Amino acid sequence: MTLDIPRIQAVLFDVDGTLSDTDDQWAGRMERFLRPMRYIFPDRSAHLIARRLIMAFETPSNSVYTLLDRLSLDADAFRVLQWVSRARRPKTPPQFWICPGVIDLLEGLHTRFPLAVVSARDETSTLRFLDQFHLSPCFGAVATSQTCRYTKPFPDPVLWAARQLGVAPEHCLMVGDTTVDVRAGRSAGAQTLGVLSGFGTESELRRAGADEILPTTAGLSLLI
């Protein structure tokens, strides 16, 4: 599959692993946890094992969230997670990491295309990420996990974002690092671009039907 570049009139971005370097942040935390146990795996680096563990966890966790969504239990699960998050929240809000080249990419793209965020994150942390890097002015719409009745991999947030931008879904490009992003985009009728800056693998993204795959999100500037 290849992208139909002239068809693209708007670009929709996932956050974690696409704009935000969340995956390396999680891997770094797990690596610090694993380092004292390095005698268990002396021939392998803690960083490599941390990344593989998170990759192994990501697909099942997406499946569980999709099931909760389908059973109309996602709102209840979200309230529980919010309560736990508030109970454990540090006095200083966490600082986010951003994928290399993303700021320049977005500052260039938003003058040529309407842009939107389509994330499975909660609204508070999504907006905090955008504000930390002064990216909010780049986006005409922000869809989070609670914006629509169903979240990714259902098409609802992609369709919602397209409506907010005033662009038909088939003229949108959904950019993300997991099969959940690709499935959501395809089911909405949008073109899809998989990026390898997160934990989705090239083979997974191709099987899901991504129209194009790039090593990094910043590489999109070379395509459009």
Locate predicted features.
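Asp-based, Mg2+/Mn2+-dependent phosphohydrolase catalytic module
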Residues: 1-11, 107, 123, 127-224
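N-terminal helical cap/lid subdomain that shapes the substrate entry/recognition surface
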Residues: 3-103, 111
